[in-house]
Amino acid sequence: VKRLLIGCLLTSLLFTLPAMAAADAAEGDVIITLGENLTEPQKQKVLEEMNAPDNAQIITVSNAEEHKYLDGLIPRAQIGTRAISSAMITIGAQGSGLDVETHNITWVTKEMYTNALITAGVKDAKIYVTAPSPVSGTAALTGLMKAYEVSSDKVIPDDVKKVATEEMVKTAKLGESIGPDKAVALLAKIKEEMANNPPQTDADLRALIEKVAKDLGITLTEEEINSLISLFNKMKNANIDWNQVNDQLSKAKDKLSAFLQSEEGKTFIQNIIDILKEIWNAIKSAFSSSEPQNNQ
């Protein structure tokens, strides 16, 4: 349990701290994607919420584009018939990494977006995802990738878009059974291992998944393992820059280590330890109070 708590804590920190990378677009460029079916009042509300600059480039995302990447991954009813998810991408300085924030997104966590965007090759950007009312958040990734292509003048290969979307959805589904933080940790660690030592066969891939899950204290069903084997086989065959993925993960770890050695990091860790102690003491107290008392 202690190992698992530490692993989840480190993974949360890994994705909270910006993953370092490089970008070609100009620092400060802002691209906004608006769902095509937003009403005018909703558009204005979203833009105000984003504090969008007047010179921001605005593009729209259609429901058809959302279905292109999500069909077959989640029920069509969940995708819906209206595109309302919106996002703002602000290009950061070289090496600033990814910083994702969300609002009204109920199923996909910001760490899941970060992990999927790394797979898609998105880097060095501050990202804000929102909707006028609570939504699952699955459709937003389509807009994010489209906006990044416009801002960076780079094309994300279609097979990479599809596998990044599948990664996001499968991580969210897995999060329902093992918890979102554990799901993100599992997928990130498997990708790191694949970048360093690509498995050659399905048996190798299964062994890798089972080993990483065991190391993180996670129990997977046979169905979940097979689903992950399918996902990572698609990643192996997609046009993914594994050197970049590995580089971002390595630099993020270096940044995490520096943070943990800083006064801010030490204070943060101590606060976590204090909270865990309080929880443990509360549990002990609850068990003690529930023990039968002997009458004297």
Language-model features: where?
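Second-shell loop/turn segments in exported
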Residues: 30-34, 98-104, 127-134, 172-176, ...
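Terminal amphipathic/targeting segments at protein termini used for secretion
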Residues: 13-25, 99, 146-149, 203, ...
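Sec-dependent N-terminal signal peptides of Gram-positive bacterial secreted proteins and lipoproteins
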Residues: 1-22, 276, 280-283
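Soluble non-cytosolic domains of exported or imported proteins
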Residues: 37-41, 103-111, 134-142, 154-159, ...
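Charged, long alpha-helical assembly modules
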Residues: 218-296
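Soluble oligomerization/assembly scaffold segments of membrane-associated complexes
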Residues: 118, 123-218
